[in-house]
């Protein structure tokens, strides 16, 4: 392996079918994004929108999970992250299926002529407080650039009637987000509470909303078993992606 390739591998995350470099992105590859990309329902989808794609992780995971006819639009406001996402996608098996748009999604969505049957986002969830090291990090971590109401409104403008809008959030933030979504006419259809171990309280929640009403299916996912190895449930969900699972 060349020195440049070795450096690249240290600045990113290697999955079974693709590599994600993230050294120019404010938010790195992490468990939240991997959970969301593996969990989001993809049956029957034809058009996917990834809001705030960052390194392109979610777009790449969804490309792996769907067939060749599915197209994915990935929108990212930060130009450095968008460029890195484009590079990651160009080196993946699916460069023709994913298009990166360097733009504010609120300006991009009104120009679209077709709706999406899956919209996905790993959104910011911190209120502005402690100052971040860079404006890019602040944009990725705080809700000041695209708050949750604006995110819900934007998704509602471009989703199909049967579509799903999926997010991952901290447990308490997710509960607040859900109440806000319900008040805006969304319906909660899927919810998975995520705990690190069986004995711990959930710390993350995976949520899928739809414009159409219907039964809400809820479950719980534990990441690690008593032996601190990945649980059967987490392994089943993510083993198509993790290199050594």
Swiss-Prot record:
The keyword Transmembrane does not apply. One of its GO terms (molecular function) is tRNA (adenine-N6)-methyltransferase activity. It is found in: Cytoplasm. SUPFAM superfamilies: S-adenosyl-L-methionine-dependent methyltransferases. InterPro entries: DNA_methylase_N6_adenine_CS, SAM-dependent_MTases_sf, Small_mtfrase_dom, tRNA_Adenine-N(6)_MTase, tRNA_adenine-N6_MeTrfase. GO terms for biological process: methylation; tRNA processing. It is an enzyme of class 2 (transferase). It catalyses: adenosine(37) in tRNA1(Val) + S-adenosyl-L-methionine = N(6)-methyladenosine(37) in tRNA1(Val) + S-adenosyl-L-homocysteine + H(+). Specifically methylates the adenine in position 37 of tRNA(1)(Val) (anticodon cmo5UAC). This is tRNA1(Val) (adenine(37)-N6)-methyltransferase. It comes from Citrobacter koseri (strain ATCC BAA-895 / CDC 4225-83 / SGSC4696). The lineage of its organism: Bacteria, Pseudomonadati, Pseudomonadota, Gammaproteobacteria, Enterobacterales.
